[in-house]
Amino acid sequence: METPGERYDYVIVGGGSAGCVLAHRLSARAACRVALVEAGDDTPPGAVPSEILDSYPMPVFCGNRWIWPDLAATATRDAPPRVYEQGRVMGGGSSINVQSANRGLPRDYDGWAEEGAQGWSWEDVLPYFRKLERDLDFPGHASHGADGPVAIRRIQPPDWPPFCHAFAQGLRRQGLAALKDQNAEFGDGYFPAAFSNENDRRVSSATAYLDAATRARPNLRIFSNTRVRRIVMEGNAARGVVAVDGSGRELRLLAGETVVCAGALQSPVLLMRAGIGDATALAQLGIASAVHLPGVGRHLQDHPTLTFCHFLAPRWRMPLERRRASMLAARLSSGVQGSEPSDLYLSSATRAAWHALGNRLGLFFLWCNRPYSRGRVELLTADPDTAPRVSLNLLDDDRDAARLMAGVRLLAGIVSAMGLSDDDQDFFPAAFSPRVKALSRFGRANARLTSMLGALLDAPAPLRRALIGRFFNGGRRMSGLLGDESALAAFVRRNVFGVWHASGTCRMGNAKDPYAVTDIEGRVHGTQALRVVDASLMPRLPSANTNIPTIMIAEKIADAMGRSAASRTPTAQPVYVDNQGDDDVH
């Protein structure tokens, strides 16, 4: 049964990293009616699930409750599809990710401006990075904010466990400099990783922006467990959305402006189902074209990534009751001819999983910054219940494969210099496979199984090697990969995966660019009253995790939308004021 249409000034589709920001900022104007529609559970103050609040994210990430379970992606053209974890919960990815608060490098945003997104250079975006954050370590620094909604902190060297000190030693012995602040000191080096966390608790976009005061605003309505089925179009104009709530009731939400914040995989899908995309491809699915924009769903990017583990003797392990496991990261240069400096990122974790087995394994994540390869999101059918085809096409550009191979060699040298073990077989490649993910799901059965497997890892080396070969690396040895170029190339292509930084599928740019989807304020080219505001807009994936850059994008566009609304209503309007950095940035 469909309810009569409810009218709002803005309907925001998706309560993720960007949507929560927009709900908070746009509803600050009391005369502005705002609806926020999220497909997953709400996480209101005082009722945030403990798994989401936890500083250690893997139990929530490896479960199915707060992700889109039917959303899958192929990593390369030859790879089978596998689940691609994207948040379906208030806060979106910021509620399930590793909490990294990485901005990237100035060149990333200067490149956006050069590619047609004028007004998005480093100088232009820095005020919004400052606006969003409350940096607990650098509150008075010119590059940092002191009163924004998102708390950001680092774990400093005096509080590092032995594994982190060993990692720092390995990086230092390979010639890398020690940096204090990855978000203000640029170039190669290692540093305490910044993350969105306070008092050892996650700070998601929902926690930061949808606080009790914001939720109490009478002009803001939040719909959770409500999935948008389609954008309502009249010609080229968006008039709102049709959604279905958890009880199966159909809702029609009318909007002066519809703002799509569903993420880089879901936002292009909503546009295409509304007839906005490649007209020929849509016609083949029986979808009438509203606006021909062939760039919708194209230009998909993610960081090509590999994982490695190292068996840890007892003196290198961290107590399980200490939750935060990732504390130290580094930027490196591959040295591949024609590549940019700082084109690799390396992070570590003192445990590979929440259980006794994972506590015996140190983890390394290696990825390529600013990948050259491009993928695509495509509709398979007009049915809104059918997931799209997601092709990451990682390593399609050989330059990405060459850089990742160089990164493996660099990592091997770093690990050798760490001094963790005399047995070189204790360091091994370990793909984040469906088997590993299944073993990482939180539960009593896995706790019992991993406790037994963990005890076996402490057995003599031959038994440990057999166990590692069966469960983690298929018998591959690092020495075999490093000594055989073709074996290393095959390993990289077989095991590469995305690190859940999907972006670029509705990229912003000049209207004369046939593959640009929006203008520099997220307004969809050729349409009226329709925007996209999320990681879809990124012209090129920055040298960073995507959460903080996405929040920055939302802050910047919310500011522009607020100024536009104010110019249409010149008489004084009441504005809700709080202590979350609500002043406009000019």
Regions found by a protein language model. Give the residues of each.
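N-terminal redox-cofactor-binding region of secreted/periplasmic oxidoreductases
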Residues: M1-H586
